């Protein structure tokens, strides 16, 4: 039993007798189990420094009694957790029956690495992702964007579209909410229940109003559960994080509270090791795979922010959301020229796909170069060849807009799951000029892949009638 001796911000110095000094990582209980601290550092034979994990109704005061639980974070694991929501301490946040097996956080870390050579493509049904940023099982995907451009909607759509294609007996889905809004977690849970996907999903949530210690530790807790599912249950894991930037932000707050010297842009000096410690665990083993999807908040929409760069270095693919594209009313607002994937290889997606991506990017890049000239002179002043490029680029930009299932409650329009082969056929026809006579606006939010051919046939029919 110890006593709180000093406190500031979310950091507390707690004194114990010499023979009762707790270990680093142990959880301390205060105020009859209403408040919890985690031992971060041992200062002397009798003094430890701890960070706040959970606060009760009353603030922690000097001389408050702290009891060493002699345990670290206990993580609920196993099939019984399907459909359950947990906090960082493993407490159940929703009504869910059953007893849970628990393992200690980080006890599932494996040094064994297994490189997946199967290159199994995961189709998301989202045209712009499946075309520009293909996803394979066991890869890491980052979704970068500033505030309010649709990161959370996209990650919810990915959960919905990918999960419903997989056999729930072979796949386990984890969602880790790191410092985001309570409302978003509640909406996601309701949507998972309504779509019957909750039966293979576990959620670990630390909300934005919780202490920085909780927001930082929730990610290792969620990863521990995912590693257990991969290795002990031999599942293929889909691991979704919203928002991994908040994990690093919480680390920055803790570093400041602990009095550590900051580095570039005010971030903690341990920024690189903090992100490496979690990213390296999101890997495949001989028992199963972990495919991770991570939203990344961009402060001031800056891709060069040190936290964003640190995260980007660990990813196989990155989706970059654009405020300009969002303002044009095109959704998902993904910028295909800024987004990239190391998985866009001929041996993975095929020669035809690679060549089409190169052709489309060439058209979009040329269009971007012409934009300033168009603003000054207008499209009609361009050379005929450039006018053709502009028309194709505008058709392509609109073609990649898509109604999403998770946005249907806002748009009042049903979602659409795109077939990859049909999409490639249509894109090839667009770049070949097969649809060049169709107005650009007709390409917006297309549903069925047959629509463009129908529109073209109707236009040709109208032209013949006018000629006659």
Curated annotation (Swiss-Prot):
Record field: catalytic activity: ATP + H2O + 4 H(+)(in) = ADP + phosphate + 5 H(+)(out)
Membrane topology: Peripheral membrane protein
PROSITE patterns: ATPASE_ALPHA_BETA
Locations listed in the record: Cell membrane
Keyword annotations from UniProtKB, A to Z: ATP synthesis, ATP-binding, Cell membrane, CF(1), Hydrogen ion transport, Ion transport, Membrane, Nucleotide-binding, Translocase, Transport
Highest taxon of source: Bacteria
UniProt enzyme class: translocase
One of the record's GO molecular function terms: proton-transporting ATP synthase activity, rotational mechanism
Protein name, entry field: ATP synthase subunit beta 2
Species per Swiss-Prot/TrEMBL record: Mycoplasmopsis pulmonis (strain UAB CTIP)
């Amino acid at each position: 039993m110890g006593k709180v001796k000093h406190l500031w911000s979310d950091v507390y110095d707690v004194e114990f007798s010499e023979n009762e000094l707790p270990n680093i990582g142990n959880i301390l209980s205060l105020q009859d189990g209403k408040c919890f601290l985690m031992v971060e550092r041992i200062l002397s034979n009798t003094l430890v420094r701890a960070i706040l994990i959970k606060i009760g109704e009353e603030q922690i005061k000097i001389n408050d009694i702290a009891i060493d639980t002699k345990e670290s974070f206990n993580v609920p694991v196993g099939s019984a957790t399907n459909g359950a929501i947990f906090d960082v301490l493993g407490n159940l946040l929703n009504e869910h029956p059953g007893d849970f097996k628990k393992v200690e956080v980080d006890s599932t870390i494996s040094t064994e690495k297994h490189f997946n050579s199967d290159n199994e493509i995961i189709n998301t049904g989202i045209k712009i992702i499946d075309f520009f940023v293909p996803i394979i099982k066991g890869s890491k995907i980052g979704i970068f964007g500033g505030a309010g451009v649709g990161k959370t909607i996209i990650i919810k759509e990915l959960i919905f579209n990918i999960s419903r294609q997989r056999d729930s007996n072979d796949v386990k889905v984890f969602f880790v909410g790191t410092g985001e809004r309570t409302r978003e977690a509640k909406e996601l849970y309701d949507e998972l229940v309504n779509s019957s996907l909750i039966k293979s999903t576990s959620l670990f949530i630390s909300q934005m109003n919780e202490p920085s210690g909780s927001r930082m530790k929730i990610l290792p807790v969620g990863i521990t559960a995912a590693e257990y599912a991969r290795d002990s249950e031999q599942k293929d894991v889909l691991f979704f994080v919203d928002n991994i930037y908040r994990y690093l932000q919480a680390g920055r707050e803790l570093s400041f509270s602990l009095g550590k010297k900051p580095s570039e842009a005010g971030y903690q000096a341990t920024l690189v090791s903090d992100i490496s410690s979690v990213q390296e665990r999101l890997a495949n083993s001989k028992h199963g795979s972990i495919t991770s999807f991570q939203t990344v908040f961009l402060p001031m929409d800056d891709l060069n922010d040190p936290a964003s760069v640190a995260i980007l270095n660990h990813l196989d693919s990155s989706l970059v959301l654009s405020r300009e594209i969002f303002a044009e009313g095109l959704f998902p607002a993904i910028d295909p020229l800024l987004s990239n994937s190391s998985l866009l290889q001929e041996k993975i997606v095929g020669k035809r796909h690679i060549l089409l991506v190169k052709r489309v990017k060439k058209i979009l890049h040329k269009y971007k170069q012409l934009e300033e000239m168009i603003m000054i002179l207008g499209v009609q002043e361009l050379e005929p060849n450039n006018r053709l490029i502009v028309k194709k680029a505008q058709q392509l930009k609109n073609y990649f807009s898509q109604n999403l299932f998770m946005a249907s409650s806002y748009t009042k329009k049903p979602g659409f799951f795109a077939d990859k082969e049909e999409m490639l056929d249509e894109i090839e026809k667009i770049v070949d000029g097969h649809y060049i006579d169709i107005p650009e606006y007709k390409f917006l939010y297309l549903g069925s892949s047959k629509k463009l051919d129908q529109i073209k046939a109707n236009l040709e029919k109208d032209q013949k009638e006018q000629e006659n």
